[in-house]
């Protein structure tokens, strides 16, 4: 029994190390194409705080506000996110900009830690506010569905996102490349939406 436990721990550690190496490799490949605007988790929090008043009123297509419960405080926490809805599922990704991914490839944002502690969330997006249950994606079939939704969908606001994060003029191809980078280095999640919206 103890040998099985040790074998499982070794396999888990090896998988985590392999994932971190993958994230670092992708980040190194893309780093030169990214602008240096968002370099840390603090920069991301600041950007989210600046967008929050606007997104809370009327989020643009492909974006929204996720509300989690703080794992330590129990208070509600809101974060602006890119979110793509497919039926009763909404896909989102925790981002790791290249500078962060190179330094800390396993970095987890506070809102993801909150979801791990309490997966019940509210999601404000086009179409209303929805209660839901969030979880990280690990199954290959679900990851492929999420990748298609997140990387192949381009909305008008994505051009501004691309202009902020990548060097040069934004194009549809560059937006898809940026979203592919976020997906490959980030933490993909799904929110299973309740059938009735809250508002």
Task: Give residue spans per PLM region.
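Short amphipathic, positively biased membrane-proximal segments
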Residues: 2-4, 24-28, 32
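Compositionally biased, intrinsically disordered low-complexity segments enriched
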Residues: 6-19
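A generic structural signal for short, solvent-exposed coil/turn residues
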Residues: 57-58, 75, 79, 84, ...
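Short beta-strand segments
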Residues: 61-99
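Short beta-strand micro-motifs in enzyme catalytic cores
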Residues: 64, 187-189
